[in-house]
């Protein structure tokens, strides 16, 4: 069975949980790993990420709080900033307002990260599996329309049902005007690139890693 449930409210987790945060963390995360990072250590808050950096000087800090890059961070939660960054062999400390909060709530099962940029890779990885939960991250003040549109796309694809990808991607593009936090044109274009990457990040034993 494939379900969709709000990551901020759900308590009934599945064998496979797929976190969705289109604008921007589940787009940025696969981009980070595609740039050669060893792994990502996720944090629910900025202070914890900074403390980790103090103990591990070579760590690269990436993330945002309410859409703004925190002081002392190396990069924003921005796929456009990361897409050409040299992260080869680096350990990343990452935090975001929505996606990492939802990650902290999931208590069982495998945890994957998906967006438009790795949609086909995600489908290939989990197609045919039972007990899948697609988890829109949404926002503290309510639903994120773009996350829920993509969640429906992913569910339909996994169920083998027909849908118009172009129409749905355009609907996601249109939601940009209604997002709480402004998104740069450069970030938006990367967030909307279907199948840009082949990797499906997975959270394993405190780290987000590329296809284990």
From Swiss-Prot:
Coiled coil: none annotated. Belongs to the ComB family. It is an enzyme of class 3 (hydrolase). Signal peptide: none annotated. Its EC number is 3.1.3.71. It holds the Pfam family 2-ph_phosp. It comes from Thermoplasma volcanium (strain ATCC 51530 / DSM 4299 / JCM 9571 / NBRC 15438 / GSS1). Keywords: Hydrolase, Magnesium. This is Probable 2-phosphosulfolactate phosphatase. GO terms for molecular function: 2-phosphosulfolactate phosphatase activity; magnesium ion binding; sulfopyruvate decarboxylase activity. Its cofactor is Mg(2+). It catalyses: (2R)-O-phospho-3-sulfolactate + H2O = (2R)-3-sulfolactate + phosphate. InterPro entries: ComB-like, ComB-like_sf.
